[in-house]
Amino acid sequence: MEIAYFLGCIMNNRYPGIEKATRVLFDKLGIELKDMEGAFCCPAPGVFGSFDKTTWAAIAARNITIAEEMGSDVMTECNGCFGSLFEANHLLKEDEEMRAKINEILKEAGREYKGEINVRHLAEILYNDVGLDKLSEVVEKPLNLNVAVHYGCHFLKPSEEINIDNPERPTILDELVEVTGAKSVDYKDKMMCCGAGGGVRSRDLDVALDFTMEKLRNMKEAGVDAIVNVCPFCHLQFDVGQMEIKDKFGEEFDIPVLHLAQLLGLAMGLPKEDLVVDAHQVCVDECLEKLEELDRLAPGSG
């Protein structure tokens, strides 16, 4: 299996450990990740798409044409990128008039959208194509952690089009997390937004942090060791947001934040240097130290 790998903007600029873990994981699974040379921003669906649908669709379609030339479906591990590219692909496949309009724009760049490929999310590929049994085979260090899974908004919705899992009571990420040996802990308002999306973080940080703080309180009450997400923007909001909440409101949480790929990386035995967790604002060391201590106490560890 091979797939075109859409990096997006935040992951490779702020959290390169997500990409590193993904490349190692897919190499072990025998899946070839093909780099999309010349890809742009997705662009953000709740920002660009809300005030200039044509420009948004044209930029997204240009990215999709790169994958079409490569003859591969697109994979992203960012909910925003997934939502934007999936929605644009669906729109242009269904709306012939819009497709013709966008192709007139793309013609100026020597490109044409053909509607030949699909847009997919990392988590969905791991669950449906790889499968839990095969994924469990790459786990070398089972993780005895209690984690709060954050689904985010664009991974499952609009559910009529995306149709990955039940949008209100999903289990796909919980099951993927538990392959690593970690426990997905239920918590209040689990499906609530991280607070950053739709331009809210840029427009009114206090409002965005109010959402984040509510989720963090619920997670803390559930007694979790870490937060696991499938979106670098949500990742940033929980990671950087904890520092901002501390500065603005004086409330501390100190809950480490990991992308699903990084959690799987830990379970594969990757060192923290490869996961680039030092780039995180919230220190992950306490979480890693807990795992090391459990390893030392495990029967047969010597």
UniProtKB/Swiss-Prot annotation:
PANTHER family, per database record: COB--COM HETERODISULFIDE REDUCTASE SUBUNIT B 1
Transmembrane segment boundaries: none
Keywords: Methanogenesis, Oxidoreductase
Entry similarity comment: Belongs to the HdrB family.
Assembly: The heterodisulfide reductase is composed of three subunits; HdrA, HdrB and HdrC. It forms a complex with the F420-non-reducing hydrogenase (Mvh), which provides the reducing equivalents to the heterodisulfide reductase.
Pathway per the UniProt entry: Cofactor metabolism; coenzyme M-coenzyme B heterodisulfide reduction; coenzyme B and coenzyme M from coenzyme M-coenzyme B heterodisulfide: step 1/1
Any one GO biological process: methanogenesis
GO molecular function annotation: CoB--CoM heterodisulfide reductase activity
Reactions performed catalytically: coenzyme B + coenzyme M + 2 reduced [2Fe-2S]-[ferredoxin] + 2 H(+) = coenzyme M-coenzyme B heterodisulfide + 2 H2 + 2 oxidized [2Fe-2S]-[ferredoxin]
Source species: Methanothermobacter thermautotrophicus (strain ATCC 29096 / DSM 1053 / JCM 10044 / NBRC 100330 / Delta H) (Methanobacterium thermoautotrophicum)
EC number: 1.8.98.5
UniProt signal peptide: none
Record function comment: Part of a complex that catalyzes the reversible reduction of CoM-S-S-CoB to the thiol-coenzymes H-S-CoM (coenzyme M) and H-S-CoB (coenzyme B).
Catalytic EC class: oxidoreductase
Pfam family, one: CCG
Xref: InterPro entries: CoB/CoM_hetero-S_Rdtase_bsu (IPR017678), Cys_rich_dom (IPR004017), HdrB/HdrD_reductase (IPR051278)
Protein name, UniProt field: H(2):CoB-CoM heterodisulfide,ferredoxin reductase subunit B
